[in-house]
């Protein structure tokens, strides 16, 4: 179960890094001509750094069989999830508004620069990242309580 959690964590991290890349490419740090991001940089940075640090702790746990490190990795996942849910709830209104503007329901199409960088996040990627993260947490919990032989 521990190795399955590791694989799930790696895949989740790669999908998350794709989202960070999209955000960095689309983000106008000068705030000239584009709406400011609704995702605070410290929250994004904290989420990414905690996720990568937690992944490292989980790898060390698997190699050393240290229960303390396993539970620490799970605690880190809780913090990672809290930051992820914070970003998700701040992204939803941007996505809804951008989809409505793209459809032209209000008689005119709104330019991309009227929306923050996270408008470019593909919905399937965001949903997939969240589902993978939930799977990772579940697998880590199962591994830590001894289901699946380690």
Stretch-by-stretch model annotation:
Residues 1-150:
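Membrane-embedded alpha-helical bundles that constitute the cytochrome b-like, heme-associated redox core
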């Amino acid at each position: 179960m521990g190795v399955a959690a590791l694989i799930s964590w790696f895949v989740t991290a790669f999908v998350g890094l794709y989202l960070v890349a999209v955000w960095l490419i689309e983000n106008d740090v000068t705030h000239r001509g584009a709406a400011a991001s609704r995702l605070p940089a410290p929250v994004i940075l904290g989420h990414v750094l905690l996720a990568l640090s937690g992944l490292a702790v989980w790898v060390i746990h698997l190699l050393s069989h240290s229960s303390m490190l396993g539970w620490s990795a799970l605690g880190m996942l809780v913090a990672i999830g809290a930051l992820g849910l914070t970003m998700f709830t701040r992204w939803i209104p941007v996505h809804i508004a951008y989809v409505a503007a793209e459809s032209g329901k209000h008689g005119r199409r709104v330019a991309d620069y009227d929306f923050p960088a996270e408008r470019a996040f593909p919905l399937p990627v965001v949903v997939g990242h969240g589902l993978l993260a939930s799977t990772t947490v579940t697998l880590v919990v199962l591994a830590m309580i001894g289901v699946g032989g380690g």
